[in-house]
């Protein structure tokens, strides 16, 4: 239950804080990248995180920033619980021009994709990655959960 609440709070926080918006066919959109495993060893946990993020988006599908309303669009990429596949999933999020990234379930894939997000200037928020190396020395990767001892 605490994990779901943390996911919801993270998603709503991102939806409310980020004003890096794109225009798509006249409508104003904020794209949020969801960098989670939906297959592989951590697929079950990643799917739960995706469900929490999708639920938050269904509850709060738009956000108002400075009096203007923006639609929140989720760009979900499966990093397949693999450090090899994580980089290509991260590159796809960069190519899709997301404003921020949420994820990943599994610290190894977060570490593997970190440089891709850093080079693109995209902030990432680790929802459940607990390895201190995910955020150590990074000005672009943040976390909302505890650290492994």
Predicted regions and their residues:
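Extracytoplasmic ligand/sensor domains, especially the bilobed periplasmic-binding protein
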Residues: 95-149
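Short, solvent-exposed loop/turn and secondary-structure capping segments
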Residues: 43-47, 87, 114, 137
């Amino acid at each position: 239950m605490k994990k779901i609440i943390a996911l919801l709070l993270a998603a709503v926080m991102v939806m409310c804080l980020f004003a890096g918006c794109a225009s798509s066919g006249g409508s104003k959109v904020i794209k949020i990248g969801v960098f989670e495993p939906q297959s592989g060893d951590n697929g079950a946990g990643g799917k739960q995180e995706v469900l929490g993020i999708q639920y938050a988006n269904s509850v709060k599908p738009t956000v108002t920033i400075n009096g203007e309303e923006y639609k929140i669009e989720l760009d979900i990429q499966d990093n397949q619980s693999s450090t090899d596949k994580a980089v290509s999933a991260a590159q796809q999020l960069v190519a899709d021009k997301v404003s921020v990234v949420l994820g990943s379930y599994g610290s190894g894939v977060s570490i593997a994709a970190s440089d891709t997000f850093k080079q693109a200037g995209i902030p990432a928020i680790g929802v459940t990655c607990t390895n201190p190396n995910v955020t150590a020395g990074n000005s672009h990767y943040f976390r909302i959960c505890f650290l492994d001892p």
